[in-house]
């Protein structure tokens, strides 16, 4: 009887327990591979020893200004070394990192700065004017607003006038700020792994953005999960096509340190730049939304450097990738892994794990299987597709729709200053994603739609994702998104917004519309066929997600379909 108590009563102490934090990965990388290249950005090349010192300098410089535990530091920058260093240097000072979407409006950034009570902001020189405008809005809205300390990052690839403008305002330059710090700074790991490491914000498409708070433990576990689920090896060469400011780059800044790999920064993402980086740096991995994959597939012969020198692994998420795009990427020599997640789950938290028996399948069937969202990450303890009324799992029949819910270490601490949203998100002991899916007999889940994106036409529920997948397989279509448009007869009907491939003759739009509708009729039930087709570029977020809320507004402004027929 006492044996059990003796076993369980052994206490934690400094020798056998340390709070988990991904910051330790940087320490190890600098120790094991000090001379290996850690970060590349144009002519800038840093080793792991140098990156380690630069991050400690950043932590020291912040600490010298009494910025640390309880403070938030914002970073407004594209994929540059300073943003990578911020993922270590800011939490090394004990502060919380808030990476800010560079494509937001000044008013939206002003909201984030005020809501997060930013003590400091590190800003890229090209974005300084945007930040100035945001700070002006903050000051006008609240007399008690305390402006954050500003640091501007210079970049040789940008026009020098932007940097001169910031320096003329008395803002300190990033490299000089680092010089004020100690390269041997003795940073302190968190006492509690529940301590916050990062703050990110949801897109806020229908209301104010919600502040997603992440902890050190989750960041540590999901960094390693990202490597294990993707089969990444030590020394991986990773191309930053995914914005680091989005969900902390899906935790890959920390992953690359754990693997002692090399980060190739890409300030602007184009198919040509991706191909060139693969050829020059021997890139092994990159992450990208389906829209980026689409640009690779449809790149011109002048842009593409083919055949690829080796297999390049691609992690795609952000929206459901059309099977046709996955198939085309595979034919080019890319190995695509589909993942799924949210800001609230540290980025991807499910993965469509590859199975050996798939090797012999036709590429079209393989693409269909790979387009599913898959199974839970190693770092996620619970994943289900639930009937939200009964909170019971739906049958694994590939047909019954439920909501994706999660629980475990990969789920956020909660929303900052938003108890109502926290209560709703964590109802019944699960995190509710708002995504609707089915579970297949093999246990793999597949998203059918966001709950708000389901189109209800008459008595039929139409998945916008399924209609979009059909549109993507049309030879003239480059990009597509489907939303509900008011319909006098059916309440709602599908409205397709379409971007045509370069070179497609669009002089006769009516003929194109008829061709697309005819094509869709051969692929889906009549009630799912788009009743409206609109041509033009689609509005995108920073990570390539289509901004459906804007398209829904546009469809509503178009007025109801008056002669819709099934």
Regions found by a protein language model. Give the residues of each.
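Conserved structural elements of the adenylate-forming
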Residues: 52-60, 179-184, 212-233, 241-245, ...
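Gly/Ser/Thr-rich phosphate-binding loop
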Residues: 175-176, 258, 283-288, 297-368, ...
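AMP-binding/adenylate-forming catalytic core of the ANL superfamily
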Residues: 75, 104, 121-123, 286, ...
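Conserved AMP-binding/adenylate-forming core of the ANL superfamily
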Residues: 17-18, 23, 35-88, 105-110, ...
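Conserved pre-ATP/AMP-binding loop-to-beta segment of ANL
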Residues: 34-37, 151-158, 165-201, 207-208, ...
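Conserved AMP-binding A3 loop
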Residues: 47-49, 197-221
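Conserved AMP-binding/adenylation subdomain of ANL enzymes
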Residues: 220-237, 245-285, 295, 299-300, ...
């Amino acid at each position: 009887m006492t044996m059990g108590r003796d076993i369980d009563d052994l206490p934690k102490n400094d020798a056998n327990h340390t709070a988990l934090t991904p910051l330790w990965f940087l320490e190890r990388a600098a120790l094991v591979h000090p001379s290996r290249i850690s970060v590349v950005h144009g002519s800038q090349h840093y080793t792991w020893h140098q990156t380690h010192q630069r991050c400690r300098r950043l932590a020291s410089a912040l600490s010298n200004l009494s910025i640390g535990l309880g403070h938030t530091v914002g970073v407004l920058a594209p994929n540059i070394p300073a943003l990578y260093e911020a993922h270590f240097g800011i939490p090394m000072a004990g502060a919380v990192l808030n990476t800010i979407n560079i494509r937001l409006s000044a008013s939206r950034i002003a909201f984030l700065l005020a809501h997060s009570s930013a003590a400091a902001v590190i800003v890229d020189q090209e974005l300084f004017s945007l930040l100035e405008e945001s700070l002006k809005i903050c000051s006008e809205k609240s007399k008690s607003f305390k402006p954050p300390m500003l640091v501007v990052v210079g970049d040789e690839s940008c026009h020098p006038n932007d940097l001169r403008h910031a320096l003329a305002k008395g803002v300190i330059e990033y490299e000089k700020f680092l010089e004020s710090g100690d390269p041997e700074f003795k940073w302190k790991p968190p006492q509690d792994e529940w301590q916050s490491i990062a703050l990110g914000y949801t897109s806020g498409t229908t209301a104010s953005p919600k502040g997603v708070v992440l902890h050190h433990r989750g960041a540590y576990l999901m960094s390693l999960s990202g490597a294990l689920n993707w089969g990444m090896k030590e020394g991986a060469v990773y191309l930053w096509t995914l914005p680091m400011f989005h969900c902390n780059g899906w935790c890959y800044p920390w992953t690359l340190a754990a693997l002692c790999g090399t980060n190739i920064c890409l300030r602007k993402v184009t198919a040509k730049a991706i191909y060139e980086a693969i050829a020059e740096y021997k890139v092994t991995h990159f992450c990208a939304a389906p829209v980026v994959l689409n640009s690779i597939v449809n790149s011109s012969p002048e842009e593409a450097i083919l055949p690829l020198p080796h297999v390049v692994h691609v992690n795609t998420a952000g929206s459901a990738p059309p099977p046709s795009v996955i198939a085309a990427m595979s034919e080019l020599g890319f190995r695509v892994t589909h993942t799924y997640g949210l800001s609230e789950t540290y980025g991807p938290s499910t993965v469509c794990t590859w199975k050996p028996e798939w090797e012999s399948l036709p590429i079209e069937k393989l693409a269909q299987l790979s387009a599913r969202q898959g199974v839970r990450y190693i770092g996620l303890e619970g994943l289900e597709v639930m009937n939200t009324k009964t909170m019971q799992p739906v049958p694994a029949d590939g047909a019954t729709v439920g909501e994706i819910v999660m629980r475990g270490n990969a789920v956020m601490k909660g929303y900052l200053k938003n108890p109502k949203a926290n209560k709703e998100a964590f109802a019944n002991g699960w995190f509710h994603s708002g995504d609707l899916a089915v579970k297949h007999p093999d246990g793999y889940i597949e998203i059918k739609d966001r709950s708000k994106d389901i189109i209800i036409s008459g008595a039929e529920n139409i998945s916008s994702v399924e209609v979009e997948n059909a549109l993507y397989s049309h030879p003239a279509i480059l990009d597509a998104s489907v939303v509900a448009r008011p319909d006098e007869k059916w309440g709602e009907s599908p409205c397709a917004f379409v971007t045509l491939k370069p070179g497609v003759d669009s002089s006769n739009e009516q003929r194109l519309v008829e061709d697309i509708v005819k094509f869709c009729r051969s692929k889906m039930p009549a009630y799912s066929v788009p009743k409206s087709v609109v041509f033009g570029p689609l509005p995108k977020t920073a990570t390539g997600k289509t901004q459906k809320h804007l398209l829904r507004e546009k469809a509503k402004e178009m007025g109801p379909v008056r002669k819709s027929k099934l």
